[in-house]
């Protein structure tokens, strides 16, 4: 389970290192009636793990990577338009030297960006990857860790952080299926349509068995 560290606290209090995000950028958005924040590692994560929720609107979605990738940036903003939500992309690396980045060189900047996001206003709900990174993706786990650390610092005593639901492999799903609440048929159909028509650069077939489930778990419940 992620725990708040002194390092995170020191980073938040520091005014020396600046991340990629500035308050002036957030000021350009109309966030008065936008009370829910979703933070994801990659474009399409917002749809795979939270598309049904996004259809309820009212979300500001922040993607940490691929802001410099023309195709993936275009797909991300097209998806948000379909959901009727606002959002932005940062440009932390997905890959470095052909390998998946562990973000070790960028942690300080990411934490500062997250602190700005979480304290820009008091969000009613904050959603992000779960501590296991769904199927174990290192950048999903890192996103969860850093968001949780900043949340603990900025939202003490509150119950506003939610993790994406637990991931189950194909052969595991039948054992737990009865305990999961599926999306409504209309939401699943619309979510699937958006993913299929917008994210043409990505192959998400291997995650299809989890598409109908978005059983988010509160920070408190995950700890129990």
Kindly give the residue locations of the regions a language model identified.
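A structural signal for short, well-ordered beta-strand segments and their strand-loop junctions
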Residues: 63, 89, 125-129, 159-165
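Short, solvent-exposed loop/turn segments at secondary-structure junctions
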Residues: 66-68, 94-95, 132-134, 167-169
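Proline-aspartate-enriched helix->loop->beta-strand connector
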Residues: 115-118, 122-132, 140-143
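The feature marks non-catalytic terminal segments
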Residues: 154-224
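A short acidic (Asp/Glu
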Residues: 48-51, 135-142, 174
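Active-site rim/loop-helix segments in enzyme catalytic domains that contact anionic ligands
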Residues: 2-121, 149-156
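Catalytic domains of cell-wall/extracellular-matrix polysaccharide-remodeling enzymes
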Residues: 131, 135-152, 158-160
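Histidine-centered active-site/metal-ligand motif
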Residues: 42, 129, 137-140, 198
